[in-house]
Amino acid sequence: MPENKIRSTTILCVRKNGKVAIGGDGQVSMGNTVMKNTAKKIRRLYDGKILSGFAGSAADAFTLFELFEKKVQEFGGSLSRSAVELAREWRTDRMLRRLEALLIVADKEESFLISGTGDVISPDEGVIAIGSGGNYALAAARALYDHTNLSPKEIVESSMKIAADICIYTNNHITLEEIL
């Protein structure tokens, strides 16, 4: 029987020298079939002041984007408060608990990974990644972050290309956003 698990995405966020960039690939796969090459998994929220990206089920992620955007409005753009409140609601609501997605959110000051288990993680370094190719992108980005003078945007571009070369669920159709 073919595997119908939906696999997709590499999302990478890099913060360095007062700038932040987030990038995501465009591939969506179901089992061993590529269903779409140009999916947009990166969004700007709160008048472009917050960047976000998702890994996991697209329908679930869009539900979470909506909820997160409401939290951001409710808490006047406070990224940390919005992230904590979304994670709390996600973890405690019976319907939301079934959503299968991870979010990375970032503004000019902070970056967070938010999960349905209630995790709100801020990276020690300026790099965070999720998705099937996340570990490849993370490793590449950390090396470039520590050993080059590349900008966050350049680190994301290079690292995403490396992840796409390694991970079969990640492609080279990269969407990239940055806050300077």
UniProtKB/Swiss-Prot annotation:
One GO MF term: threonine-type endopeptidase activity
Protein name (Swiss-Prot/TrEMBL): ATP-dependent protease subunit HslV
Swiss-Prot/TrEMBL catalytic activity: ATP-dependent cleavage of peptide bonds with broad specificity
Alphabetized PROSITE patterns for the sequence: PROTEASOME_BETA_2
Protein family according to the UniProt entry: Belongs to the peptidase T1B family. HslV subfamily.
Assembly and interaction partners: A double ring-shaped homohexamer of HslV is capped on each side by a ring-shaped HslU homohexamer. The assembly of the HslU/HslV complex is dependent on binding of ATP.
Activity regulation behaviour: Allosterically activated by HslU binding.
Organism listed in the record: Leptospira interrogans serogroup Icterohaemorrhagiae serovar Lai (strain 56601)
Lineage: Bacteria, Pseudomonadati, Spirochaetota, Spirochaetia, Leptospirales
Function according to Swiss-Prot or TrEMBL: Protease subunit of a proteasome-like degradation complex believed to be a general protein degrading machinery.
Positions bound to Na(+): A164, C167, T170
HAMAP family the UniProt entry points to: HslV
Keywords, ordered alphabetically: Allosteric enzyme, Cytoplasm, Hydrolase, Metal-binding, Protease, Sodium, Threonine protease
